[in-house]
């Protein structure tokens, strides 16, 4: 920070007391971030131009110019809202006399109320002090001296418009045979849209595949039933033929074995036992032994076995009757 020279006693002290109506301290505004009022950025813009006729009273303004830091120029955007014209226009040499001395000390505290620019807007805070020359990106460029008579203009610029979110591209239409996926839903939509979409797709798929007519379904079912019935009839016929063949063979064997009468009904098991004993009896007559254990039975024993088998079969028939 630059060193401020100390004022010497003499005419300077008298002039300062007269011009400022007493000793006052010049306060520097603190740094505060710029605020937004109803979505608009507010900032101060200095449109003052230096006047060559402005002469400091007894060197006071020259010293004020030396003590004021040099701010960096800011690019000026195109104003949107109309700015309030400065009050009182430009100052003349006569108006800068003793009557405007109180305004010299309070020049840095002046700002317009936003109520005059737009109703309902809050009063903007004072702008932060400009950055020092060592941190200024634009280099040490001198700004014209600010006249205390001229007042800054407050411009309102609309906030930058946000880009609208682009809609997602529609998925390509798949063939009707495949299942159609549900379209991507936005966060605000409910789950009922996806459910209705799935139901609608299923309805379209079912309508795309034609159903069988009632007449065709009846004809197909009747054909199936007829085929099954034919197969059952063929199986029954084969079983019947087998049973009839076996029954005929046992009947022929029964006629060859001895029995009480030819009209006597014998079971297949009884017919087989009588036939075995009858064969053993005939073998004993020929002096042959066909027995399983080679017991060498006599002819009378073989006849008794046949008799016992016929009697047991007769008793069984009587019990059944």
UniProtKB/Swiss-Prot annotation:
Residues 230-243 are annotated as: Basic motif. It comes from the Eukaryota. Keywords: Cytoplasm, Developmental protein, Differentiation, DNA-binding, Neurogenesis, Nucleus, Transcription, Transcription regulation. Residues 93-109 have a biased composition (Basic and acidic residues). One of its GO terms (molecular function) is E-box binding. It is found in: Nucleus; Nucleus speckle; Cytoplasm. Residues 59-193, 203-222 are annotated as: Disordered. Residues 70-85, 121-132, 160-186 have a biased composition (Pro residues). Residues 244-282 are annotated as: Helix-loop-helix motif. GO terms for biological process: anatomical structure morphogenesis; cell differentiation; formation of primary germ layer; myoblast proliferation; negative regulation of DNA-templated transcription; negative regulation of endothelial cell proliferation; negative regulation of gene expression; nervous system development. Expressed in lung, liver, kidney, heart and pancreas. Expressed in endothel of umbilical vessels. Residues 230-282 form the bHLH domain. Efficient DNA binding requires dimerization with another bHLH protein. Interacts with NEUROG3 and NEUROD1. Interacts with ZFPM2; mediates indirect interaction with GATA4. Forms a heterodimer with TCF3; repress transcription of TCF3 and TCF3/NEUROG3 dimer-induced transactivation of E box-dependent promoters. Transcription factor that binds a palindromic (canonical) core consensus DNA sequence 5'-CANNTG- 3' known as an E-box element, possibly as a heterodimer with other bHLH proteins. Regulates endothelial cell proliferation, migration and tube-like structures formation. Modulates endothelial cell differentiation through NOS3. May be implicated in specification and differentiation of neuronal cell lineages in the brain. May participate in kidney development and may be involved in podocyte differentiation. The bHLH domain mediates transcriptional repression by inhibiting TCF3 transcriptional activity through heterodimerization. This is Transcription factor ATOH8. It comes from Homo sapiens (Human). The lineage of its organism: Eukaryota, Metazoa, Chordata, Craniata, Vertebrata. The gene is ATOH8.
């Amino acid at each position: 920070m630059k060193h401020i020279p100390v004022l010497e006693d003499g005419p300077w002290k008298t002039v300062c007391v007269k011009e400022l109506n007493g000793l006052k301290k010049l306060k520097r505004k603190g740094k505060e971030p710029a605020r937004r009022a109803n979505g608009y950025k507010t900032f101060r813009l200095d449109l003052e131009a230096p006047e060559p006729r402005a002469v400091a009273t007894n060197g006071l303004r020259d010293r004020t110019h030396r003590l004021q830091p040099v701010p960096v120029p800011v690019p000026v955007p195109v104003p949107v809202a109309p700015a309030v014209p400065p009050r009182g226009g430009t100052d003349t040499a006569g108006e800068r006399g003793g009557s405007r001395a109180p305004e010299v000390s309070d020049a840095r505290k002046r700002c317009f109320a936003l109520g005059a620019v737009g109703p309902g807007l809050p009063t903007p805070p004072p702008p932060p002090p400009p950055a020092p020359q060592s941190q200024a990106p634009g280099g040490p460029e001198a700004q014209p001296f600010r006249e205390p008579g001229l007042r800054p203009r407050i411009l309102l610029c609309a906030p930058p418009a946000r880009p609208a979110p682009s809609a997602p591209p529609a998925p390509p239409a798949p063939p009707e045979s495949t299942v159609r996926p549900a379209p991507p839903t936005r966060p605000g939509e409910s789950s009922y849209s996806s459910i209705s979409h799935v139901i609608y797709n299923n309805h379209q798929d079912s309508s795309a595949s034609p159903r069988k007519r009632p007449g065709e379904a009846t004809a197909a079912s009747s054909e199936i039933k007829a085929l099954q019935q034919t197969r059952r009839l063929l199986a029954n016929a084969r079983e019947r033929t087998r049973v009839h063949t076996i029954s005929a063979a046992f009947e022929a064997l029964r006629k060859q074995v001895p029995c009480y009468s030819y009209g006597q009904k014998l079971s297949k098991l009884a017919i087989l036992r009588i036939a075995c004993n009858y064969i053993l009896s005939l073998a004993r007559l020929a002096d042959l032994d066909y027995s399983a254990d080679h017991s060498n039975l006599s002819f009378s024993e073989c006849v008794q076995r046949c008799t016992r088998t016929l009697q047991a079969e007769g008793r069984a028939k009587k019990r059944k009757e």
